[in-house]
């Protein structure tokens, strides 16, 4: 009897099921061996992988999904304690936040004056300083020439003052001796005509008396007030008041030194 195609197909399917059932039986070799247990080196690789993942996570932008990524990368076998990886995550986030803040502060501090408008202003200021230097060279040269002329006049005055002092000293000595002779001959304040060798009148000389008052000092004011007020406290207040009313005169002048002072 010839077999039909449907029967042949059924036989083939049965054989296939039989083979599949035999292959699905567990064998001795499929049992987990001791070598499959995680070793210390694998733990080290896990820690190195965790440090690498931490450094890569510090460069991510969004912080909202960071915790979820953290849980995905670390399975429960690596971190069986939920609180442990929570603490690890918080420490990492806090350190990254602090580092970013320090970098931002350092950048602002180092670049706060390096903006384009400030650079442009610096360039303009440099250009104006160069122009001022050119003007100042001419002004300084003119000022230098004037100061040299002033120093020439000062030198002449000092030289003439030295000669004049000698003349003044000699004149004073002669004056004292003449007054002694006038007093000796009792000439008094009579005027005397003085002529030169050619009988030309040079001038009229006589003894003259002049009276001047000295400067009003604080002691004089205090003594005068005490004669009237007779109260030391009030006198002190009045003297202080008078002193404050004195006018103050200011003037500017050139002072010359030897150059070392």
UniProtKB/Swiss-Prot annotation:
Domain of life, source organism: Viruses
InterPro entries (UniProt xref): DUF5760 (IPR043918)
Listed Polar residues bias regions:
1-12
The yes or no answer to whether the keyword Coiled coil is present is yes
* Coiled coil regions in record: 151-181, 218-243
Compositionally biased spans, kind Basic and acidic residues: 65-74, 122-139
Print the keywords alphabetically. Answer: Coiled coil
Q: Where is the composition biased (Acidic residues)?
A: 79-108
Region described as Disordered: spans on this chain = 1-139
Protein name (database record): Uncharacterized protein L491
This chain's source organism reads Acanthamoeba polyphaga mimivirus
């Amino acid at each position: 009897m010839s077999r039909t195609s449907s029967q042949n197909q059924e036989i083939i399917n049965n054989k296939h099921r039989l083979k599949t059932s035999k292959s699905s039986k567990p064998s001795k070799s499929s049992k987990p061996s001791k070598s499959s247990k995680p070793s210390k080196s694998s733990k080290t690789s896990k820690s190195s992988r965790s440090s690498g993942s931490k450094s890569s996570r510090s460069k991510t932008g969004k912080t909202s999904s960071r915790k979820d990524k953290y849980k995905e990368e670390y399975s429960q076998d690596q971190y069986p304690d939920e609180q442990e990886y929570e603490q690890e995550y918080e420490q990492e986030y806090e350190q990254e936040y602090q580092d970013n803040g320090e970098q931002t502060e350092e950048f602002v501090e180092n670049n706060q004056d390096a903006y384009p408008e400030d650079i442009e202003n610096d360039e303009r200021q440099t250009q104006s300083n160069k122009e001022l230097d050119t003007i100042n060279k001419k002004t300084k040269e003119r000022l230098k020439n004037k100061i040299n002329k002033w120093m020439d006049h000062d030198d002449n005055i000092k030289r003439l003052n030295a000669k004049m002092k000698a003349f003044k000293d000699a004149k004073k000595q002669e004056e004292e001796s003449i007054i002694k002779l006038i007093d000796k001959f009792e000439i008094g304040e009579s005027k005397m005509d003085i002529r030169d060798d050619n009988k030309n009148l040079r001038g009229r000389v006589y003894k003259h008396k002049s009276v001047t008052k000295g400067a009003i000092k604080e002691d004089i004011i205090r003594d005068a007030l005490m004669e009237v007020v007779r109260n030391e406290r009030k006198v002190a207040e009045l003297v202080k008041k008078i002193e404050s009313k004195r006018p103050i005169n200011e003037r500017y002048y050139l002072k010359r030194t030897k150059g070392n002072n």
